[in-house]
Design a protein with these regions (language model features):
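Asp-based, Mg2+/Mn2+-dependent phosphohydrolase catalytic module
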Residues: 1-31, 93-113, 122-153, 157-222
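Active-site neighborhood of HAD-like aspartate-dependent phosphohydrolases
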Residues: 3-77
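Ser/Thr-centric signal marking residues that sit
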Residues: 42, 80, 177
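Catalytic P-loop NTPase motifs of RecA-like helicase/translocase cores
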Residues: 43-45, 86, 160-161
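A broad detector of the eukaryotic-type serine/threonine protein kinase catalytic domain
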Residues: 48-49, 84, 120, 145
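Flexible, glycine- and charge-enriched loops at secondary-structure boundaries
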Residues: 52-59, 91-96, 130
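Substrate-recognition element of Asp-dependent hydrolases with the DxDx(T/V) motif
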Residues: 62, 66-99, 111-124, 164
Length: 222
């Protein structure tokens, strides 16, 4: 059973900590890099407000990504907007069932140490956790001793990358899965307007192919 912690009394946020994972605690106590992932369209196929565990299907190569992170002792953290909760399409219990199935499919021996979720919709206040707010990532960094400057964020939407950029993550990766195809031009235009001092250009990949995993491994080892 997944451990859960309600971070706010209004239940707009939920965090799952995987305490049993060997990578949960930093052995040295020092800051360490992590891989931050969006969920829908990156880890699992985006099926438009998924609420049933039977509909969970991993994106291509996701297990290989987790295996790579595990072999390099790099923790993985998922950050996800779940506006279907505030819209009334499903509740937190439904979300947890989907989460349990996702973790099961990733397999038990993986590097996932936490999942941060926000249940608010597009009209969420600016101080909420909803991406593009950096607050989910910043909370993860504080609680799990993550060095954001050496971390990676992988997303299919511009909001994922802005969330990472505004939290201090330098390595941004955009995938074509999920909403990636429709978002890519928007992302290219956004970062073309920024100077090199403001942000590094994102790395663009199609999916978690063997070639893409080599790129991710090179970033981690650099």
């Amino acid at each position: 059973m997944i451990s859960k912690l309600n971070e706010l009394s209004n239940t707009s946020n939920l965090v799952n900590f995987f305490y049993s994972n060997r990578l949960f605690f930093s052995e040295s106590g020092n800051l360490r890099p992590a891989i931050f992932l969006d969920r829908d369209g990156v880890v699992i196929k985006d099926k438009h407000f998924i609420s049933l565990s039977k509909d969970v299907e991993l994106e291509f190569g996701v297990n290989n990504l987790f295996s790579l992170a595990n072999s390099l002792n790099i923790p993985v953290i998922i950050i996800t907007n779940q506006s279907g909760i505030s819209r009334g399409f499903f509740n937190w219990d439904d979300y947890l069932k989907v989460t349990e199935e996702m973790v099961k499919q990733i397999n038990i021996d993986n590097s996932l140490i936490a999942i941060f979720a926000n249940g608010l919709g597009p009209d969420a206040p600016l101080h909420s956790w909803r991406k593009p707010s950096p607050l989910m990532i910043q909370n993860a960094s504080f609680n799990l001793k993550i060095d954001l400057s050496k971390s990676i964020i992988i997303g299919d939407r511009l909001t994922d990358l802005i969330s990472g950029l505004d939290s201090g993550i330098m390595n941004l990766i955009h995938v074509k899965t999920g909403h990636g195809i429709s978002e890519r031009k928007k992302i290219e235009n956004y970062f073309d307007k920024l100077s090199e001092e403001e942000a590094k250009k994102p790395i663009f990949i199609n999916n978690f192919s063997e070639e893409s995993l080599k790129i991710i491994e090179k970033i981690i080892k650099s």
